[in-house]
A protein has these predicted regions:
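Membrane-interface helix-loop-helix junctions at transmembrane boundaries of multi-pass membrane enzymes
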Residues: 222-232, 321-344
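Contiguous transmembrane helix-bundle modules in multi-pass membrane proteins
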Residues: 182-183, 201, 334-415
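Membrane-interface starts of transmembrane alpha-helices
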Residues: 12-16, 99-106, 110, 131-139, ...
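Membrane-embedded helix bundles of polyisoprenyl
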Residues: 21, 112, 116-128, 134-219, ...
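Alpha-helical transmembrane segments
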Residues: 13-28, 189, 237-241, 282, ...
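Membrane-interface coil-to-helix junctions
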Residues: 22-118, 141-163, 256-263, 269-311, ...
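Membrane-embedded alpha-helical segments of multi-pass membrane proteins
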Residues: 109-117, 159-167, 206, 311-318, ...
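Start-transfer (signal-anchor) and selected internal transmembrane alpha helices
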Residues: 1-32, 229-233
Length: 415
């Protein structure tokens, strides 16, 4: 089915997804919608109040006053023009257009639009891989309300990057499918917006895109020539998108070179990068696969690093059932073994964090794993209801139960 094919509104999965997403947002964010609280935090998420919200107020004031963008409040003065491109992103543009007295509501509306983007555009992406059905809707919802999005999404910029990442993946899949060329322009512009939003998220997403193109080409049994052609085209569009955002390149480069990350790239030790995590770090990985809260919240958090920086892998317990099902099913066993082994390797090796985040003491890249988990859940639900061999379903369920029990025993022995 194409994206433009019309269906009766009560049968349109996008309409139902819109309603479900809106309902879940209302439920999860009712404290801010109905309880008289602003969507800012004063605990370990205090950056939202001390940095983000303050910046939004300042840029909203500058926009409304018509000032040049040179702030005298910062030391001897500071040119803020290099920050302006970030407010061309629709989610951020809303924040400076809203009157300052309505800024708390604008922040909440922006969060809603980001989650809605992840849900609806995520659905369009997953539909290209598995068609319509309950699995596609489940995958979109699993991604939108995954542990990473809900936790790190409290940091407004992270949620913006997750929404743009979802849009990027949709246009990337359109490109790989050879669809209309205007969609390539969407891919280019999304790269530009990602550059404005966060240079290191763009960097991480570029790595994921390369992996995705390679693995997708292998799964689709495409020729090396075809895969290489797609990779070159993707690289060209990435460069074009970066050049379009050229106004932000110089300040971004300056910010990076002056940051701690630049020193980490060249000065960090490489010892132990290919030795799997052990002890507390490994226990945290297992625990946070089930829930962000399993090791406590904020100051009560007992895992590795801190509540935010500790790895976040929680999507749904259905991930275990999906993996087990595809491992048991003969037609998918080899692919499942390969992909599961690859994901586990990336998660347990410090090398991954060092390459993607420039330090082994951060796991901000794990949104990629959550995105793949949501895909696995969708494929599982899409396939399991069509599976005629009930023995496969039962064996998959039994294996999942064993794996789940073993992981829980390990987690509680660690705690």
């Amino acid at each position: 089915m194409t994206d433009t094919k019309r269906k009766p509104i009560w049968k349109n999965e996008l309409v139902w997804l819109f309603l479900i997403t809106s309902g879940l947002f209302t439920l999860l964010y009712s404290k801010f919608l109905l309880g008289g609280f602003a969507y800012v935090f004063t605990d370990c998420g205090a950056d939202t109040l001390q940095i983000n919200y303050a910046q939004y107020e300042m840029f909203s004031s500058l926009f409304r006053s018509g000032d040049s963008g040179y702030a005298l409040q910062a030391g001897l003065g500071m040119d803020l023009s290099s920050y302006c491109p970030a407010y061309l992103i629709p989610y951020n543009l809303l924040l400076i257009l809203a009157p300052q007295r309505l800024l708390p509501w604008a922040v909440l509306a922006s969060a809603y639009l980001k989650l809605l983007t992840m849900s609806l555009v995520g659905y369009l992406f997953y539909r290209k891989l598995m068609g319509e059905g309950i699995g596609t809707m489940a995958a979109a919802l699993a991604w939108t309300f995954s542990g990473y999005v809900i936790l790190w999404g409290q940091q407004y910029g992270f949620c913006t990057c997750m929404a743009l990442f979802t849009v990027f993946m949709y246009f990337l899949q359109c490109y790989l499918n050879g669809e209309k060329r205007w969609k390539n322009a969407g891919l280019v512009l999304t790269v530009t917006m990602l550059l404005f939003a966060s240079y290191y998220f763009l960097y991480m997403i570029a790595f994921f895109a390369v992996f995705y193109v390679v693995i997708y080409s292998i799964m689709q049994k495409r020729s090396i020539k075809s895969a290489a052609g797609k990779m070159i085209g993707l690289g060209g569009m990435g460069i074009l998108g970066t050049l379009i955002g050229g106004i932000a390149l110089v300040p971004i480069a300056d910010t990076f070179l002056e940051s701690a990350r630049a020193g980490a790239v060249s000065g960090g030790s490489t010892s132990g990068l290919f030795h799997p995590y052990k002890g507390k770090t490994l226990g945290t990985i297992f625990a946070r696969f089930f829930s962000n809260q399993m090791l406590g919240i904020d100051k009560e958090y007992s895992g590795n690093l801190n509540y935010y920086e500790g790895i976040v892998l929680a999507v749904s317990i259905l991930t275990v059932f999906a993996i087990s099902y595809f491992l048991v099913k003969k037609a998918t066993r080899i692919k499942a073994i390969f992909l599961t082994a690859l994901m586990v390797f990336l998660v347990v090796m410090p090398f991954t964090s060092r390459v993607l985040v420039f330090t082994k003491n951060s796991h901000r890249w794990c949104f990629m794993i959550c995105f793949v988990e949501a895909l696995a859940i969708g494929l599982f639900l899409q396939d399991v209801f069509r599976e005629k061999n009930k023995k496969t379903v039962l064996c998959g369920g039994a294996l999942a139960t064993i794996i789940y029990a073993a992981m829980m025993v390990f987690v509680y022995s660690f705690k």
